[in-house]
């Protein structure tokens, strides 16, 4: 039985919103929360009415990172248990987010530290409130980021900037996060969910298979050698050739009219 509040899930107008819901713990990612996020993602992947997912937090934090108090027992039990319970779980979540076939947009409403920052890194798109802050404070606890942050952050912002954040634990504000490429845009706190929904609406108007193909091409390609990445791009292009939407898109272009996509 879960004793802590679980993430909230709402679905409307083709958009799923997952809200981390442990505000008193700054939405720290304990085992139960991670497991429930994975269940939600499994559920939403097969729901054809859902075109995109918005991930946000309640209270003043997006997520302050791993629930260290809860993970302490795993760490105390030694490397094998810590790797099984903590690292594989956390990396499994961020890998699931990164490779998800539908867009997941991080709507960063406040602190995104440690594992919370790693979740943002894994999301293909991110919008931050102007009050948000980002940090990699794991070094102050004696370990490196374990949820994929040592690999994704350098790919996003460059090796030197990433190492400065990882080795110092210093935080950056939302404007700096946008400048270095950690988030796409910064808006006021009041406009955060409005901006996230607007981005979802723009993407949802595009052909669903093509959106999924673009996500797969970029995510898988950026982690591959160029020849392998080009093969991924070609295979994803082939996915779209058999769809109705590609023919509709080409006809609409030739006829100089807006396309009417069906997701087929």
Task: State what each model feature region is.
Residues 1-58, 81, 92-95:
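Conserved CoA-thioester-binding segment of acyl-CoA-metabolizing enzymes
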Residues 215-224:
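Short, charged, surface-exposed hinge/linker loops at domain edges
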Residues 2, 95-211, 238-243, 247-248, ...:
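Crotonase-fold acyl-CoA enzyme core
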Residues 33-36, 86-89, 192, 233:
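Hydrophobic alpha-helical membrane-association signature
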Residues 18, 22, 36-37, 55, ...:
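Terminal peptide-recognition signature
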